[in-house]
Amino acid sequence: MSAVRLLWAQMKRRAPRLANLIRIPVLVFFRPRRAYTRAHLACVRAYDESIRWISRLIEGALAHAVEVQRTRGLVRGDGGNSVGYRLEAAAASLGIRYLDKRYRHVFQDTLSVQWDRWFGSEHFSGESIVLAIGTLGPGGSERQVVTTLLGLAAAGYRDLYLLCTYSGGQASRFYAHLLEGCPVTISELSAGLGDAHDGGGGDEALPCGGLKVLRDKLPDDLKDIACFARDLLARRPRIVHAWLDWNNVKAGLAAAVIGVPRIVLSTRSITPDNFPLFQPYMREAYRALAEHPTVCLLNNSEAGARAYEQWLGLPHGTFNVVRNGFDFSSLEPANKVAPAREFRARLGISHEAPLIGSVLRFSEEKRPLLWVDVAARVSERRPDVMFLMIGDGPLREETRRHAEACGIGDRIVMPGYEKDSASAIAAMDLFLLTSRVEGLPNVLVEAQALGVPVVTTHVGGTAETLVQGETGYAVFPHSADLLANAVLKILGNAPWRQAARKAASQFVRERFPVSRMLEGTLDAYFGGGEFAKRRDR
């Protein structure tokens, strides 16, 4: 064995391309999840993308993705037309196709079983609705879950449940206080089946034999589908509405297996293979669920819907678009003048200083380092401008160091999370977003509702949130220079800013009312007209 390892080490050093070609098919059979990661790395040669995939390769599994510093020199920039690149890409493609085939068989086998004998789909006759999401942490999707629950309650629905994968800790309950007084029961996903397989678990009504069969049929990375099935069986809902890819796949498959009459899956961005927590089973899971007669697929932007359809090879129109909805009563610009002044005073920001800001998670896909690069270029021409970055995340300290290295560390304020993000946004003169990938960002809508013009990278559905040249700018390509030019253009045109404040507030109120989002959601639940009937009661 030591001789084999020595030969392998020499091969990796002297012939790395050949070593990679050998390694991928070997990993496919012995460590398929790691092979999937390595395969993607072989296909990606852009600098930022390569660093992302290297970070996951180090961990050995996509589920344990890490954020790493963007250190130069980790990946050699081989040309896309080189023989080595083409050979490695071909090997990568074989690995990906193998995994797709593997998971396709898993889902086909699971959904082909006649589960009625265990779970009895005829018992799903109540009115309960279960929404499933990871947490109620400080994210845009989480905020929309809360808005949906509040809207359903206002429309007359009382049998509401929220199933969170994790609800412990303050950060994971960031929006929970908004549901106080709302007729919704919040619970956390069971950690396992416990004694359900032998008739225990504290609920004699649960079909324990079926849960055990389901769990035993699934590979290790999908066994928690049985946990979703257990918790959903305890409620026997008429509707399961899952949010975000991980929950869509696992809660969706669990709901399909146990016979929930209506399953709605809300995708909230572009395809999951653009994000660190992507899992190799997701594509085939979505394909299997798309063919299920009780499943309705949603996205919150046209760009996101079309991206999923292309990724999955599905016909145009398979994904319906239900845009985010907002209660604009809490986003009146006139009501935020005093809180905005108080916010600036609390952070020591002069009321006279132009303030460019953002609300973001300090993570790779939000590109906070690019945000700082834009700020540095703006400050070169406008030394009076201050900068504000609201939020937290794994790259926060690196972002702070980068700002200091750019010479603007004393002009960027990073206070962490703010409960009252609306007052923070209202204190800004311009909102800047530099994301690499996005769905339909809540913050862009909220900023415009408060009369704050926006500059954003043109990705996903960002351009759908604004009127180009009237309420802000969606910029492409995503260079710091182009983004800085858009920012400076707005800062240097006071009449334009005044007109944009009014136009932006009016535009988002017409396009993103909560009533329209609820109507689309209830159409997905019941079909046309249900929202109107409830509203007229």
What are these language model-derived features?
Residues G84-S93, H292-P333:
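A short, active-site helix/loop in glycosyltransferases that binds the activated sugar's phosphate group
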Residues V467-G469, Y473-A480, K489-P495:
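Conserved acidic donor-binding segment of nucleotide-sugar-dependent glycosyltransferases
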Residues L41-R97, K101-R104, D109, D116-G126, ...:
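N-terminal strand-loop element at the rim of the active site
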Residues E142-L150, P354-E380, P394-R400, D481-L482:
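A conserved mid-protein helix/loop that constitutes part of the nucleotide-sugar donor-binding site
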Residues Y417, R436:
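Aromatic "clamp/platform" in nucleotide-sugar-dependent glycosyltransferases that forms part
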Residues D221, A242-N248, T267:
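Short His-centered aromatic/hydrophobic patch
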Residues L163, L444, P453-T456, L466:
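Short hydrophobic beta-strand element within catalytic cores of glycosyltransferases
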Residues E342-A345, E398-R401, K489, W496-E510, ...:
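A short, well-ordered alpha-helix in the C-terminal region of glycosyltransferases
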